[in-house]
């Protein structure tokens, strides 16, 4: 009985694990859901809970020296 009570208390107070891969991805897994986008990101759509789907802007790679 003590074992059951101990396991119940331990499992009851554990916080559930958050799977960030499925919760925070948007735009066909190319963007992330955030409160606001960074300078190098563009707003592509909206996520749940009034979050914004931000996708990183890739540079063209052309540099002049």
Swiss-Prot record:
Transmembrane domains' residue ranges: none
UniProt signal peptide: 1-20
Key word Membrane present: yes
Family statement: Belongs to the beta-defensin family.
Name recorded for this polypeptide: Beta-defensin 106A
Lineage, highest ranks first: Eukaryota, Metazoa, Chordata, Craniata, Vertebrata
Xref: Pfam families: Defensin_beta_2
GO biological process, one term: defense response to bacterium
UniProt keyword annotation of Transmembrane helix present: no
Gene behind this protein: DEFB106A
Swiss-Prot/TrEMBL keywords: Antibiotic, Antimicrobial, Defensin, Disulfide bond, Membrane, Secreted, Signal
Subcellular location: Secreted; Membrane
Cysteine pairs bridged by disulfides in the record: 26-53, 33-47, 37-54
Quaternary structure (record): Monomer. Interacts with CCR2 (via extracellular N-terminal region); this interaction may preferentially require specific tyrosine sulfation on CCR2.
């Amino acid at each position: 009985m003590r074992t059951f009570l101990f396991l119940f208390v331990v499992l009851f107070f554990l916080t559930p694990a958050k799977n960030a891969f499925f919760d925070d991805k948007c735009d066909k897994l190319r963007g992330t859901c955030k409160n606001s986008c960074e300078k190098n990101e563009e707003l592509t759509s909206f996520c749940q809970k009034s979050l914004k789907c931000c996708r990183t802007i890739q540079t063209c790679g052309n540099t002049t020296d």
